[in-house]
C-alpha cells in the first residue's frame, strides 16, 4: 500500500463522570515508525471499505479556517490538532452518549492525493499470553469498529473549493446520529447525496428502456448490464462514470444513455460513488416488515411470482426446497 504519512498527532479524551470529559494533549507529534505506518494502513483500509456520506465545510467553519492557516504554515500541525481536540471536547460534552477515546489527526498521501483523517478511536481491553505462558491484560485500539471518522481530501478541497464531496464521514447509529456532533465539530454540511445519485441512475435506466419500448426480458437484460458495470466499480473501489457506462451499454435509439440522462434532467454527476443497496434493485426485489422478509430475482416477477396490486397479494408458484421442507415438517407435526 502506497501510503506516506506526513504528520500524525494523538490526543485523548477521558470521561471522568457524567458531566466531565477531560483532555490529555501530547506535546509533540507522533514519530512515524513501522507500528504507526501499520496502524494508519489498517485505518485507511477499514475506512475506505465502509459506506460514507459526503460533505463540505460551512462558510464559518473554525476548523476549516484553522486548517487553512496550518496549510499555509501560519500554525504548525501540532498546535492545530491540540486546538481542534479542545473544540471536539466542547462539542462532544453536549451529548449524553459522550465517551472518551484516542483522538487521531493524520495528514498523509495515498496515490498522489493528500488527506487529513480525523478520528476518535475506542480503546478496548483484552487478554494476552506471553512467552512464559503467563496471562495478562492488554489494551488495543478498536480500529475495525471505528465509527467516528472523517476524512478531508486536501487535494480536492484546495484545487476545487466548490466541490460538494471533498469531505467524507461515517454515519453512526447510536441514538441521535453519532455523526451529528462530529459534523457540528467540523462545521460542515452534507454535500453529494450518494443514494439520491444512485436512485436517479436507476430511474434514468428505467425511463431509457421505456422510451425505447423494450420488452420485459430485454429491459431486465439491460438492467443487468448496468448492474454488472456498477458492481465492478463498487468492488474495485471506483466511482460510476456516466460516460464509461454509456460506452458499455448498447445505444437505444438516436441518443446514448449519457445524452438521454443529461437531456431529461436527472441531475446526475459525471461520476459518483456506487451504493450497494440501491444498485441491488436493478436485479432484485426485496423488502421486509411485519415479520416477513422477501428477496427474489427480478426475472421471476410474472414468471413464478405474481403481484395483484388491487389486493396487494403476492403469489409464489414453487417454493425453495428448504422452505418447502420446513413447511411440510410443520404441517406434519399438527
UniProtKB/Swiss-Prot annotation:
GO molecular function: double-stranded DNA binding; single-stranded RNA binding
Assigned keywords, A-Z: Cytoplasm
Main location: cytoplasm
Membrane-spanning segments: none
InterPro entries: Nucleoid_associated_NdpA
GO cellular component, one term: bacterial nucleoid
Compartments, record wording: Cytoplasm, Nucleoid
HAMAP family referenced in this protein's UniProt entry, alphabetically: NdpA
Family: Belongs to the YejK family.
Record's protein name: Nucleoid-associated protein YPO1262/y2922/YP_0879
Amino acid at each position: 500500500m502506497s501510503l506516506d504519512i506526513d504528520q500524525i498527532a494523538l490526543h485523548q479524551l477521558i470521561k471522568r463522570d457524567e458531566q466531565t470529559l477531560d483532555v490529555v494533549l501530547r506535546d509533540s507529534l507522533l514519530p512515524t515508525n513501522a507500528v504507526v505506518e501499520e496502524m494508519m494502513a489498517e485505518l485507511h483500509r477499514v475506512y475506505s471499505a465502509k459506506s460514507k456520506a459526503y460533505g463540505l465545510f460551512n462558510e464559518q467553519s473554525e476548523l476549516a479556517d484553522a486548517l487553512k492557516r496550518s496549510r499555509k504554515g501560519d500554525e504548525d500541525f501540532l498546535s492545530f490538532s491540540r486546538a481542534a481536540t479542545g473544540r471536539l471536547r466542547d462539542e462532544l460534552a453536549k451529548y449524553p452518549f459522550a465517551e472518551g477515546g484516542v483522538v487521531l489527526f493524520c495528514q498523509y498521501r495515498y496515490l498522489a492525493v493528500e488527506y487529513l483523517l480525523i478520528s476518535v478511536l475506542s480503546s478496548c481491553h483484552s487478554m494476552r499470553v506471553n512467552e512464559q505462558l503467563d496471562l495478562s491484560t492488554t489494551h488495543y485500539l478498536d480500529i475495525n469498529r471505528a465509527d467516528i471518522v472523517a476524512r478531508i481530501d486536501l487535494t480536492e478541497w484546495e484545487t476545487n473549493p466548490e466541490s460538494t464531496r471533498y469531505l467524507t464521514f461515517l454515519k453512526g447509529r447510536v441514538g441521535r446520529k453519532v455523526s451529528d456532533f462530529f459534523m457540528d465539530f467540523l462545521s460542515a454540511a452534507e454535500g453529494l447525496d450518494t443514494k439520491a445519485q444512485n436512485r436517479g441512475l436507476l430511474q434514468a435506466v428505467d425511463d431509457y428502456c421505456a422510451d425505447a419500448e423494450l420488452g420485459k426480458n430485454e429491459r431486465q437484460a439491460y438492467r443487468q448490464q448496468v448492474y454488472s458495470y456498477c458492481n465492478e466499480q463498487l468492488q474495485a473501489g471506483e466511482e460510476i462514470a456516466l460516460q464509461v457506462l454509456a460506452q458499455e451499454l448498447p445505444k437505444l435509439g438516436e441518443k446514448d444513455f449519457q445524452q438521454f440522462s443529461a437531456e431529461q434532467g436527472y441531475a446526475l454527476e459525471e461520476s459518483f460513488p456506487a451504493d450497494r443497496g440501491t444498485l441491488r434493485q436493478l436485479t432484485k426485489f426485496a423488502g421486509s416488515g411485519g415479520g416477513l422478509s422477501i428477496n427474489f430475482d427480478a426475472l421471476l416477477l410474472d414468471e413464478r411470482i405474481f403481484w395483484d396490486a388491487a389486493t396487494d397479494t403476492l403469489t409464489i408458484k414453487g417454493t425453495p426446497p428448504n422452505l418447502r421442507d420446513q413447511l411440510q415438517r410443520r404441517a406434519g407435526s399438527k
